[in-house]
Regions:
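Domain-level signature for soluble enzymes in the chorismate/prephenate branch of the shikimate pathway
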Residues: 1-198
Length: 198
């Protein structure tokens, strides 16, 4: 009989495949899921609530982007909290237009994504006035919903890994306004006891 192994829980905003999960992989390595439970949360508010309720030991929060500055909803919640910063990581952010298999750019009528992702791709979107822009709570969740609905006239803006996770097709790549786009994430805990050992 094998002994149960404790795995600390880190919550992040978004669905699996979100850039926050990519940041966890960068911070802890590609085998992160072997040693840590990664818990998706639908909103920043839910993220801070889950740690306040003791349902996660850590949360990973996007705090600043090189193109758009502060991720203000996350910053506001962090500043109101008494959480300690126990780790930090910055990752490159590459945005892709992801649709259902067989989707082609000429047929896309609507694009959805998190407002921060949309803001980082404003030049691409401004050049496509025929495309309706739909803000959502999450980049990865947007891809999941587009694929689930099966509407080839809708696409989402998200990271490459989401296409792999949800069975989408990358229609256009590198939509961000600048190739050096990156986001800084903070690993937060209720106490300043350091990041988990993995």
């Amino acid at each position: 009989m094998s002994a149960l192994v404790y795995k600390p829980r880190i919550a992040f905003q978004g669905e699996h495949g979100a850039f926050s999960e990519d940041a966890a992989i960068e911070l802890f390595g590609p085998q992160v899921s072997n040693s840590i439970d990664l818990e998706p949360c639908p909103t920043f508010e839910a993220l801070f609530n889950i740690i306040d309720a003791g349902q996660a030991e850590y949360i990973l929060v996007p705090i600043e982007n090189s193109l758009i500055g502060s991720i203000q909803p996350a910053v506001d919640l962090f500043e109101k909290s008494s959480l300690a910063v126990v780790g930090e990581v910055a990752i490159p952010i590459r945005h892709h237009l992801i649709g259902c298999p067989g989707s082609v750019f000429a047929e896309i009528e609507a694009v959805e994504s998190h407002p921060a992702a949309l803001a980082q791709c404003k030049n691409f979107l401004a050049a496509q006035p025929q495309i309706k822009v739909i803000p959502t709570d999450d980049t990865a969740g947007s891809v999941a919903q587009v694929i689930k609905r099966g509407d080839r006239k809708h696409a989402a803006i998200a990271g490459r890994r989401t296409a792999e996770l949800y069975g989408g097709s990358i229609i256009r790549s590198n939509l961000e306004d600048h190739p050096d786009n990156q986001t800084r994430f903070l690993l937060l805990a209720r106490e300043a006891h350091g990041k988990p050992n993995v």
